[in-house]
């Protein structure tokens, strides 16, 4: 049995998967964001509960919005303050009495998609999340590629490329990022970035869904904004794909439901790639919000 935990800022989602990788149990509980002992107890309690239910010791994987420090294995995270700077893996292993694997939640999302039946033959799968933030992960031959510092998938903290600044024009906003730097892709390509750019250029705040609906209805400002954003996305995807060269790219997060992306990217991205390169297949993520839990559980298969 494989246990997956998706530890977010407000909730912990648990999933149990059998040997056929079928989900056989689900539970959601509030995240004790500021109480580290309670966080440990909550996770350990769920493990004990489902060990008893399934009469076995499940293998444990955990995804969270952050990463482990590659040198001392303490957790680097903003959204789960209780775990910040703590040796979460070591403390969980001591409390539960078995191995625990921890990975960035975007990498878990990517791993979930890579292990979908339709993509298992793809040598490399990249998962990109266009949600509240922008980030992703690269899966190579069924394994998460984390890099020396466990930051290989932190694409949201790459800077906006020169082509993008030219495209956005003289009035381009220099947006700050939660990491403390400015100009990060996270601030521009996320659903939040989609809204911030609209507010910057048109002086009014609108939700992403309302901008998309206005575009479909023929609104001139919305149409201009969508055109600008699609080209911006293509420019940045071109840089990311050139550096990583994935076979398949799966998009998740709220903005990934904007169907126009799947029509426009195959047409726009190629001009930002090397002349010998082909644009990878770009698809909508199949497992949606459950991807983080699936990927966390699957860390113990090939992760």
UniProtKB/Swiss-Prot annotation:
Q: Its domain of life? A: Bacteria
InterPro entries found in the cross-reference section: ATPase_NBD (IPR043129), N-acetyl-D-glucosamine_kinase (IPR023505), ROK (IPR000600), ROK_cs (IPR049874)
Q: Which GO terms describe its molecular function?
A: ATP binding; N-acetylglucosamine kinase activity; zinc ion binding
Q: Any idea which positions bind Zn(2+)?
A: 157, 177, 179, 184
Q: Which UniProt keywords apply?
A: ATP-binding, Carbohydrate metabolism, Kinase, Metal-binding, Nucleotide-binding, Transferase, Zinc
Q: Does the keyword Transcription apply?
A: no
The reaction(s) this protein catalyses:
N-acetyl-D-glucosamine + ATP = N-acetyl-D-glucosamine 6-phosphate + ADP + H(+)
Q: Where does ATP bind?
A: 4-11, 133-140
Using the UniProt record, name the top-level EC class of this enzyme in a single word.
transferase
Q: What is its EC number?
A: 2.7.1.59
Pathways per UniProt: Cell wall biogenesis; peptidoglycan recycling
Cystine crosslinks: none
One GO BP = peptidoglycan turnover
Say which family it is in. Answer: Belongs to the ROK (NagC/XylR) family. NagK subfamily.
Q: What does this protein do?
A: Catalyzes the phosphorylation of N-acetyl-D-glucosamine (GlcNAc) derived from cell-wall degradation, yielding GlcNAc-6-P.
**What name goes with this protein?**
N-acetyl-D-glucosamine kinase
Q: Which organism is it from?
A: Vibrio vulnificus (strain CMCP6)
